[in-house]
Amino acid sequence: MIRPLTFAFTLLLLLGSIDQVFGQSENGFVSLFNGKDLTGWASVNTAPDTWTVKDGLLVCSGKPIGVMRSEKQYENFILHIEWRHMKAGGNSGVFVWSEGFVPEGRRLPKGMEVQMLELDWINIHKRNGKPNHIGYISGELFGANGLEATPDNPRGKRSMSKELRCKGKGEWNVYDVVCVDGTVKLSINGKFVNSIRNSSMRKGYLCLESEGSEIHFRNIRILELPPGITTAEQTAKVIK
């Protein structure tokens, strides 16, 4: 029997290279952003003007801090998303397997965060007068607000990428995120460099993060894979 994670990578091999799968052809992927409006998404705790569409791009003002979520839950899937920060030190991310709501007293939801930080963040947020840890801008994976997971390249509870592949302000970055049976593997600009496993949540919502500065998104697509053995405790409650 082919396990779902093996299936996911077998699929990549059959379809071709990362660029071929995610950049040049749909290959069964479904668009999550139509380039015209916010169909398929719901604001959780942001303002009416936080998320807008301009010239076919999804534009996030960064204010206030919060998220918008997908209307649908996802379990096993491959997510393709392209992003660029418009301000030095910008902060954002995408949550997978999220509960899709924000508890009282918090600004962000429970979920697995796939970090998106602009490269100057470590210079703006110095530690003891020196640039902060490079892991922050590497495309880290970590459980947020109660989600537990095991990092494959640990930096505390976070998993940092093994190579620094993110591009800076005004440049487009490409994330391909494979999420199967509690394991998340991240490709940054065409190369798999990070992973985390044993997630306590394995089915939930996608959330896009607004956190202080303008960020643009485009080409948000998803390929759903066969379901796994996911328990009720590992599944987010449906939001009606």
Spans of features found by a protein language model:
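Carbohydrate-interacting regions of secretory-pathway proteins
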Residues: 22-240
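Bacterial N-terminal signal peptides
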Residues: 8-17
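Positively charged n-region of N-terminal signal peptides that target proteins for export
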Residues: 1-6
